Amino acid sequence: MGKNQVKSRGDWGLLGQGEAHSGEKCYLCSVMGVYRSLSPEEFRDIQQRILLEDNHLLIFNKRTGEIVQGDKTGDEPLSETLKAFIAQRDGKPGQVFMGVPHRLDRPVSGVVLFAKTSKALERLNEMLRKGEIHKTYWALTANRPPKDTDILTDNMVRNEAQNKSYVAQNGKEARLKYTLIQTTERYFLLEVELYTGRHHQIRCQLSHMGCPIKGDLKYGAKRSNPDGGISLLARHIQFIHPVKKTEVDVTAPVPVSWKGIEG
């Protein structure tokens, strides 16, 4: 077993809040520059889901059920899995940097952006703050929207205890644009562009419109999806590379479970 590897997920440990970088949780193996060994099957799977990678950033195709960054569940996040992958692939000694400028909810799939250097992370965070990173989402719903395209403007509040957001008069403004782009015998596919970034914004606003996302029991769907996720895909991301200053334009494939949807 190499010095950059540990036996299994069971070797994970959490540092205390005071020891974690920037006040966030971090894993003991990561801080020590020691990473678990990925099986050949997991290694190939991770490799095949990298949509773009260079020395500064990595764009990954997330599946439903995966978490992007560590949370209270203690499940291994993609940020740590990717560190282990890079350490194993490149024979990289010491720590691997994998910054997280944005996240996707556990039940959501699609494009996730990671920074491979602190410089890239700082610049990507600034670009996100300025609205210079453009993302579009695809959502499947069983109900046809009132209009084929529209801009939704609502006020939203977040209930921390329920981990759920609601439309309410005393909330913060939430705006998005949706467009109906495909239909199947049972479902309608909406393309969504966010103008604000509220908690569960797409899920909440589409539900409030009468179009809960397929599989999203929390926001009014009638039944769950077999994989436990919801039919919301981070479909596309486009921005100017923070270091190279070239255009980055990446599209995630349509999940195989989305039968009848053309990608």
PLM regions and their residue ranges:
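RNA pseudouridine synthases
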Residues: 2-12, 24-263
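Cationic, amphipathic, low-complexity segments that mediate targeting or membrane/lipid association
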Residues: 17-20
